[in-house]
Amino acid sequence: MRRVYIPKSNGKERPLGIPTMKDRAMQALYLLALEPIAETLADGNSYGFRPERSTTDALQQCFKILVGRKSAHWILEGDIKGCFDNISHQWILDHVQLDKIILQKWLKAGFVYKNQLFPTETGTPQGGIVSPTLANRVLDGLEVILNKKFAITKRNGINHNPNVNLVRYADDFIITGKTKELLENEVRPLVGIYG
């Protein structure tokens, strides 16, 4: 895999992995098998790099959870820094339900930069066809954890809704909450443990 760097809007550079044509074809075939499995396990409010979902869908969900009279008043915004570069190979190998031999070869293939081969111990390259789906598999599950921990409960016959909702687009997300304290003291530590 060849490594190139493209400029980001903040002045930094983003590393991209450019697979060979053979690797691209193999990854496309692998993705045909992986994507249906990943879709059945995906968080309902995950919108990045998924079929039939877009930024518009993510924005509509944000609007839906934020405009009601009883909607949350606070938002925790998150961006998982270096998400693609820091994904655990072992987690992927343990949790992706397809052929591990091929997957491990891709993950450990390394990259070439300035005619020098560099090994890869973590991460999945941005630019790889299967990488966005692998990243989503790693990030899926947070919504389920939040929904279990912050479910609507009844106290003294009155519904108590903490208004905790997750909307994720790739490695960027927002989590809503009824109070700032709820987000800071309960949600944020949970997100930190998950990540």
Model-derived segments and spans:
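Conserved polymerase palm-domain catalytic core
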Residues: 3-4, 9, 44-45, 57-195
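Conserved phosphate-binding loops in nucleotide/dinucleotide-binding enzymes
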Residues: 15-18
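Generic detector of ordered secondary-structure context
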Residues: 21-22, 54, 165
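Duplex nucleic acid-engaging cores and interfaces of nucleic-acid transaction enzymes
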Residues: 22-27, 59, 63
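Active/ligand-binding-proximal structured segments within catalytic/core domains
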Residues: 26-34, 134-135
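Charged boundary/loop elements
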Residues: 32, 36-48
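Active-site beta-loop-alpha junctions of metal-dependent nucleic acid enzymes
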Residues: 51-57
